[in-house]
């Protein structure tokens, strides 16, 4: 796969797969810590073999919310988003005239990382 985009599109069609295209260690970390991706897609045009190994190692060593413990409710907010994705029913969405029913709210507040 040259860009990672094709496999990302294919994988994302499978139930419960949350794929992310990543080209760096920071992107992989954010993909898991903030978005809960469970499949990484990397393109050989942009990710060298050693970088791919570093990306995989970083991803495998992280989890949703890790590194953001200082940010109050970071995990809870992002978990809510993942749960909404998991609960999404495409057939009901189609029958509802492609209108998204709101599943929940979570209060947001800007947090500043302590020094």
Show where each model-derived region lies.
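Glycine/small-residue-rich loop that forms an oxyanion/phosphate-binding "nest" at active or ligand-binding sites
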Residues: 3, 20-24
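C-terminal binding/interaction regions
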Residues: 25-115
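Secondary-structure boundary/capping signal
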Residues: 18-19, 39
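Short Gly/Thr/Asp-enriched flexible loops that form oxyanion-binding sites at enzyme active sites
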Residues: 6-18
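Gly/Ser/Thr-rich loops at beta-strand to alpha-helix junctions
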Residues: 3-6, 47
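Conserved residues at beta->alpha junctions
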Residues: 1-2, 43
């Amino acid at each position: 796969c040259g860009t990672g985009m094709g496999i990302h599109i294919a994988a994302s069609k499978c139930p419960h797969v949350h794929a992310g295209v990543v080209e760096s260690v920071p992107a992989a970390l954010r993909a898991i810590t903030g978005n809960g991706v469970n499949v990484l897609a990397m393109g050989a045009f942009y990710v060298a073999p050693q970088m791919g190994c570093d990306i995989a190692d970083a991803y495998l060593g992280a989890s949703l919310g890790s590194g953001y413990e200082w940010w109050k409710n970071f995990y809870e907010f992002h978990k809510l988003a993942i749960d909404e994705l998991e609960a999404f029913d495409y057939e009901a969405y189609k029958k509802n005239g492609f209108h998204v029913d709101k599943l929940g709210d979570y209060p947001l507040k800007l947090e500043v990382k302590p020094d």
